[in-house]
Design a protein with these regions (language model features):
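Short glycine-/aliphatic-rich beta-strand segments at the starts of folded cytosolic domains
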Residues: 1-11, 40-43
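A generic structural motif
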Residues: 9, 48-50
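Short, conserved charged micro-motifs
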Residues: 14-16, 50-56
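C-terminal structural segments of small proteins and small subunits
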Residues: 55-79
Length: 79
């Protein structure tokens, strides 16, 4: 079983790296780009075959280590 975790900055938090990427893309001719927000994508292979228990464990991982819940949001998908 695999957990896929997406971590992004909360909308209220400035994303200077995303702003630089956005400006750079505009400079390269991609004029339709309005805004970029950069985040993290994490895949975790899990031995547990119980989807509910696996998601609970990954939720704990996110709260304890993978994300800074003060400035970041995360989503978890078990596949």
């Amino acid at each position: 079983m695999k957990a896929i975790v997406h971590i992004t900055l909360k909308e209220s938090v400035l994303d200077p790296e995303g702003e630089v990427i956005s400006r750079s893309l505009n400079g390269l001719g991609f004029k339709d780009v309005i805004k970029v927000r950069k985040g993290k994508y994490i895949e975790i292979d899990i031995k547990n075959n119980d989807k509910v228990a696996a998601k609970e464990d990954v939720e704990k991982m996110c709260k304890k280590l993978l994300s800074n819940t003060i400035i970041e949001n995360y989503s978890i998908k078990i596949v």
